[in-house]
Structure formats: C-alpha cells, structure tokens
C-alpha cells in the first residue's frame, strides 16, 4: 500500500489476464453485509467503449490509457428473490437445507423493506466500496496501478451500459494499468497521510 498511489498517467500496457483474475477474485472474496454481495464488477477493455466512458467520466485520461476498466455496479434494491438466491446458493455450497436461513432472511427483509429503495441502493453501494478497496489492495500486491474514481455521471453511464431494467446501478470506476513515469506528475511525490 505504500507503493500504490492514484496514478495520473498510464502507459497503455496490457495487464496479464492472470493478474486481472487475481484482482477480480479479491472482489469476490470481499466481505459484505450479511454475505449478500449485492454488486458485481464489469470488466471493460474495448477502446471504443472506453472513449465513450471517458466523456462521461469528466475526460479523465486514465479511462482510455488503462489496460482494463473495472466498473462496479450495485443492486438498486433488496428483494426476497435476490436475497433468497444468494442464501440458497450458500446453503447448497455448504450442503445444508435452504430452510436454515429462513428466519435470518425474514429478519433482514423485515428490517430492509420499510427503509425504501433509496436506502437499499445506498446500502448496496456501500458494499461495493468494500470490494473496490479490496481490488485496489490486490492490484497493489500485483504491482498493478489503479486510479480510484467516483468522478463520473452515474445515470449516463448506466444508460451507456444498458443497466436499466437489470437491477444494477453504477457506483465506482477503477482503471487498471501501469504508470507512465515521465508524464505522471504525482509518481515521485512523497506519499502523505494524516498522522496516527
């Protein structure tokens, strides 16, 4: 983590697929509230699509200079169907009956449902931030540079990626690539954090 920084200029070199897979696996293993993992990660490397995303992301060049762009998208709401699907899969993997989760599921839904869809979307979005942080740490472990991004127009990106009707909304962008030392003003700056 001392090595990583928010890379300002990437050189376009491709990140090997095994490193991309490692980073994605870190997002999959990320903790989430009640283990629901209410998000997924889209991987984009098509240059024409990245050009369109750059326009939506306030013309940040890392979007087109990166090797792969990770787009984090989160559930727009918690539903019985979604929660059941995750819990049923979990029980199947553990060789246990689905009914083992019935009381817990009912409790979650009784708490979440009255809070409304805006709360649901916000809560799911926060879970994607945890996975986002795991991806950044995993990338640093692999010596892959990243630029964490919230700076983009979510609704326009959702439209471009045709997320309407899928139950997902975009939350974060994470370009992956390699720094271009000679053209990155931040690369040699001292890393500074507030004191302990």
Protein language model annotation of sequence segments:
Residues 20-24, 53-57, 161:
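A generic alpha-helix structural signal
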Residues 30, 34, 52, 138:
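Short alpha-helical functional segments enriched in proximate histidine and acidic residues
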Residues 62-76, 163-183:
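A glycine-rich helix N-cap at a beta->alpha junction
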Residues 23-29, 70, 106-160:
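Small-aliphatic-rich amphipathic alpha-helix that forms the alpha element of a beta-alpha
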Residues 78, 139-145, 181-183:
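Short helix-capping/linker segments at secondary-structure and domain boundaries
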Residues 1, 6-7, 169-196:
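C-terminal helix-cap and adjacent tail motif
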Residues 42-126:
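Glycine/small-residue-rich phosphate/adenosyl-binding loop
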Residues 3-37:
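An N-terminal domain-cap segment
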């Amino acid at each position: 983590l001392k090595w990583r920084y928010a890379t300002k200029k990437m050189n376009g070199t491709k990140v090997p697929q095994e490193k991309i897979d490692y980073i994605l696996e870190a997002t999959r293993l990320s903790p989430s509230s009640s283990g629901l993992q209410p998000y997924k990660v889209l991987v984009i490397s098509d240059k024409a699509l990245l050009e369109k995303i750059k326009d939506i992301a306030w013309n940040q060049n890392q979007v087109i200079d990166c090797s792969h762009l990770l787009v984090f998208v989160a559930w727009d709401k918690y539903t019985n169907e979604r929660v059941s699907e995750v819990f049923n899969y979990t029980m199947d993997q553990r060789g246990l009956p689905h009914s083992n989760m019935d009381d817990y599921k009912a409790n979650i839904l009784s708490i979440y449902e009255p809070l409304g869809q805006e709360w649901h979307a916000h809560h799911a979005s926060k879970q994607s931030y945890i996975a986002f942080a795991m991806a950044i740490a995993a990338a640093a472990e692999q010596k892959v540079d990243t630029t964490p991004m919230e700076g983009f127009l979510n609704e326009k990106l959702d439209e471009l990626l045709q997320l309407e009707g899928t139950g997902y909304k975009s939350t974060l962008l994470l370009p992956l690539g390699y720094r271009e030392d000679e053209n990155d003003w931040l690369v040699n700056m001292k890393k500074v954090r507030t004191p302990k």
